[in-house]
Amino acid sequence: MNSYRSIFSPARSRERRDNFEDYWIYSQDHAGEILEDERNLTRKKEVLTRFQNLAIRSRSLLSDPKSFYRNYLRIVDDPRSLDRKTLLLTFLYKFARHEWAGISAVWDGIPTMARSRSTTEKISRYRLCEEFCHIRLFHEMFRTFQLDQIEWVPLGKWMGRVYRYLPKFPEWLMSPPAFVSELMGLTLYRHLDRLLDDILADEPEARDHVRMMLREIMIDELAHTGQRRNFIGPIGIAASRRMIAPMFRMFYRDLPESAYLLDVGKMIEEATAFDYSAMAPDVIASSWVPSYCRREPRTSVSAS
């Protein structure tokens, strides 16, 4: 029997409250103490240092590094003219840039740890630090392919305003799209893992290095997806499921490389039917799963 339920499984309000506390304990044990001034976490900082100390670099430069730098902020060449390795790396940058722009914009709008009054507020601040740690891992991925000149550039004034206002929206309104965004990232990382053997076959050391860094991110994103699910009641979870297809298509339409790398239709199917059994056992073992998504007796949690 499958050990896990769908991510869309119903959850009682008491269960969700208890799961926030459980997630908060897991997060601190997994990622360490918050270094708020650095937007960092102690254990995540150690993980990055280990990857950097390995100093793994690709055997060869990209066939045309100038092509990468010309297209990594915005595609200016015909994507069909780019080799798949360059397409993969320009896509990765654009995806990570959205993440970086979002967390940078909302950082000042989220209560500091000292001003956080609830577990969920502490989680929000802490999780932003985790996301900044992910950007540092992405940066190391580009350095792995000897791309040392990239810069993290804001998306523009309009998008910056959008991201800055997001924390001001009520939780019931923002939770469903935020949950779908996490599910979109998790689904993407699973598909990227499948692409690595094909696109990076000639760079086995760099491929494995990137895969391990993506695994670190995937472990966190799996936990973030469950944590985001925890905010949502029955109406919101039904709305979330209906949002998957339009949100996925709208997001990937803005990343031209995705048409040449990803099967977005398949990703939508996987997200709509997602349960934790789809993940590798070692990833699940290092991550966090809500209690109501496990096939364990639930008698200890009272109804509400």
What annotation goes with each model-predicted range?
Residues 1-304:
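Non-heme di-metal
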